[in-house]
């Protein structure tokens, strides 16, 4: 299990959503698996379609109360935060697997899911 750097609260408090995502995802995704620059590009692409520049802005509504807005993604659902990145991960690994393949050798990916409500619309982004 990864551990946070000693001064993470101070060092990461000023980061943008995408920069914070890069730091957090890097704890779980080895640079041997996805080089840091590739991971940064995946994160930036995943959240570039969000309607708010902060992706998921945090608003203070009371002395100790905050609201995190998770509806600024392409389908207005909180699930966009995870599924936009997941779709780009699928594409990244598929492109890597197909790098030197042609024609019938090339692999494809089919995602089959059953859902209701807002999840289905989010998953269509794949």
Which residues does each predicted region cover?
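PLP-dependent amino-acid enzyme catalytic core
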Residues: 1-126
């Amino acid at each position: 299990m990864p551990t946070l750097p000693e001064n993470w609260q101070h060092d990461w408090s000023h980061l943008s959503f995408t920069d914070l995502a890069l730091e957090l995802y890097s704890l779980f995704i080895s640079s041997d698996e996805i080089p840091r620059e590739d991971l940064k590009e995946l994160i930036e692409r995943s959240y570039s379609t969000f309607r708010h520049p902060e992706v998921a802005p945090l608003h203070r509504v009371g002395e100790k109360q905050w609201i995190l807005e998770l509806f600024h993604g392409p389908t207005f659902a909180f699930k966009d935060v995870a599924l936009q990145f997941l779709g780009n991960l699928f594409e990244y690994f598929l492109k890597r697997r197909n790098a030197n393949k042609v024609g019938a050798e090339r692999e494809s990916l089919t995602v089959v899911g059953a859902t209701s409500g807002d999840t289905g619309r989010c998953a269509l982004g794949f």
